[in-house]
Amino acid sequence: MAGEQTTTEYISHHLTNWTYGYLPGEGWKVAYNAEEASAMGFKAIHLDSMLWSIGLGIVFCAIFWMVARKVTSGVPGKTQAAVEMIVEFVDNNVRDSYSGTSKLIAPLALTIFVWIFLMNLMDLLPVDFIPMIAGQIGALMGHDPHHVYFKIVPTTDPNITLGMSFSVFILILFYSIKEKGLGGFVGELTLHPFSAKNPIVQIILIPINFILEFVTLIAKPISLGLRLFGNMYAGELIFILIALMPFWIQWALSVPWAIFHILIITLQAFVFMMLTIVYMSLASSTEH
């Protein structure tokens, strides 16, 4: 594919999602190119990101469900041993970092870690393999293969990463209000970090405190989502740039980068999980 397109077209093709949305003047349709996808704005859905994220979520649930069905107290198989190791790893991190009493946090952390890891893992597939298959299927259906877009790494889509981070943010707000009450939650936003014994001075400080605390609060989901997106997007872009090089150089660079990238995809899943645990712990804490 790289040989049939210019460098710019090749990179743009691999970084464009399979998008369905509302295009002004043409109605609801699948975007024919990156310009149409951009013109759709917020009235669009990235079908490939949805397909892969939901599919990998089902794979995660299916694997853990099958292991739970066949669990044995004797010598475990390789799959059971791997699942038990992951569960124990996540559980230990929750015990060490979460000070609340909710039983939701451990399953939440496990889901986040494994799901993000599986989505990140797709970045290790050859960059042209799945898009080439998608292009051939599109050609059989009468479409121009150069205008068939199919990204396979959901975490390189900010809609996915920010969607997950703002879902965590909703839980943070819920547990903050649940544990501290509405008054306590509002007090955290308006009475800290600056306080005064003089009530008039305290009233003056309320808008300042609110601005500072609100920015701190809203920065949590934004930084959580963009950190994952930025690291995975950069990793995917490097793989694409390597694919543009001569064949003999590709192997010399792609293998070391893929080995190093295994650390990145695992680390990013771990960081997202740990920050979720810490944020939920802070939300459940009655101390400020």
UniProtKB/Swiss-Prot annotation:
Pfam family of the protein (one): ATP-synt_A
GO cellular component entries: plasma membrane; proton-transporting ATP synthase complex
Keywords: ATP synthesis, Cell inner membrane, Cell membrane, CF(0), Hydrogen ion transport, Ion transport, Membrane, Transmembrane, Transmembrane helix, Transport
Locations listed in the record: Cell inner membrane
Matching PROSITE patterns: ATPASE_A (PS00449)
Single GO term (MF): proton-transporting ATP synthase activity, rotational mechanism
Residue spans crossing the bilayer: 47-67, 104-124, 157-177, 199-219, 237-257, 258-278
Main location per the UniProt record: membrane
SUPFAM superfamilies reported for this sequence: F1F0 ATP synthase subunit A
InterPro entries xref list: ATP_syn_F0_a_bact/chloroplast (IPR045082), ATP_synth_F0_asu (IPR000568), ATP_synth_F0_asu_AS (IPR023011), F0_ATP_A_sf (IPR035908)
Topology versus the membrane: Multi-pass membrane protein
GO biological process terms, semicolon-separated: proton motive force-driven plasma membrane ATP synthesis
Description of how the protein assembles with itself and partners: F-type ATPases have 2 components, CF(1) - the catalytic core - and CF(0) - the membrane proton channel. CF(1) has five subunits: alpha(3), beta(3), gamma(1), delta(1), epsilon(1). CF(0) has three main subunits: a(1), b(2) and c(9-12). The alpha and beta chains form an alternating ring which encloses part of the gamma chain. CF(1) is attached to CF(0) by a central stalk formed by the gamma and epsilon chains, while a peripheral stalk is formed by the delta and b chains.
Similarity field: Belongs to the ATPase A chain family.
Protein purpose: Key component of the proton channel; it plays a direct role in the translocation of protons across the membrane.
PANTHER family, sorted: ATP SYNTHASE SUBUNIT A, CHLOROPLASTIC (PTHR42823:SF3)
Listed name of the protein: ATP synthase subunit a
High-level lineage: Bacteria, Pseudomonadati, Pseudomonadota, Gammaproteobacteria, Moraxellales
Gene from which this protein is expressed: atpB
